[in-house]
């Protein structure tokens, strides 16, 4: 059983908290401290952002984080190295990479999948990869027992949902809002209806991200989703608490986890 499946099974009906941070923001040492701190505070799965120069799906908060990481010279290989170091002391917590296809394409799909598996990566989500073009990467990830995680948006068609249901591993990431990450309004009733619809086709856990920023919104979404994915709010805590990032993020993660237990 994969680490992601084990993580969901261990919750015994509870809801997973999946926080997102950008690797290298503000630096590698802090990233590692944040990863361990978030796990200690209740995170069930970690989502690591791979910095990219044109993060079209991200709002301004995560864009700034990517810019800071890139200014530090962070590359995809550095991200894999961070996971490798994390695995020296944590062999249980699942780690998912989230980013754009370009850095993976440059490395080569086979090499990336092999190196990701060796480093201890459990899943990969590329936000700009249409299903029609992801077949090569999907095969390499599957051959190396790394889950290929897909986004589903409010506008995703039924045919595409059916295809995703056949290919997806680990969990499916439902984008609860149209637009970029960090958008403000979240219609929990609409999300609930959409999750119920998706469950007709998808038999792995469905996580919800985009727009979850506090305990109240996490609690509401946790009533219908298997996982709560929080990115912009976590990254904003890092941005606003220079020198005290781990403590600030740890407190927020604990608050969010307590809301969905």
From Swiss-Prot:
GO terms for molecular function: tryptophan synthase activity. The lineage of its organism: Bacteria, Pseudomonadati, Pseudomonadota, Betaproteobacteria, Neisseriales. SUPFAM superfamilies: Ribulose-phoshate binding barrel (SSF51366). PROSITE patterns: TRP_SYNTHASE_ALPHA. Its EC number is 4.2.1.20. The active site is at residues 47, 58. Keywords: Amino-acid biosynthesis, Aromatic amino acid biosynthesis, Lyase, Tryptophan biosynthesis. InterPro entries: Aldolase_TIM, RibuloseP-bd_barrel, Trp_synthase_alpha_AS, Trp_synthase_suA. It comes from Neisseria gonorrhoeae (strain ATCC 700825 / FA 1090). This is Tryptophan synthase alpha chain. Belongs to the TrpA family. Pathway: Amino-acid biosynthesis; L-tryptophan biosynthesis; L-tryptophan from chorismate: step 5/5. Tetramer of two alpha and two beta chains.
